[in-house]
């Protein structure tokens, strides 16, 4: 899980979701692409 100021989809499998007011990226193909937006 990477925590970044700005999250962007890294491939076509990345999905942008919101959990508890946080923007997150989840990826079915490559788990390394998981990201969460910081403060």
Swiss-Prot record:
The lineage of its organism: Bacteria, Bacillati, Bacillota, Bacilli, Lactobacillales. Belongs to the bacterial ribosomal protein bL36 family. GO terms for cellular component: cytoplasm; ribonucleoprotein complex; ribosome. It comes from Lactiplantibacillus plantarum (strain ATCC BAA-793 / NCIMB 8826 / WCFS1) (Lactobacillus plantarum). Keywords: Ribonucleoprotein, Ribosomal protein. GO terms for biological process: translation. Pfam families: Ribosomal_L36 (PF00444). One of its GO terms (molecular function) is structural constituent of ribosome. The gene is rpmJ. This is Large ribosomal subunit protein bL36. The keyword Ribosomal protein applies.
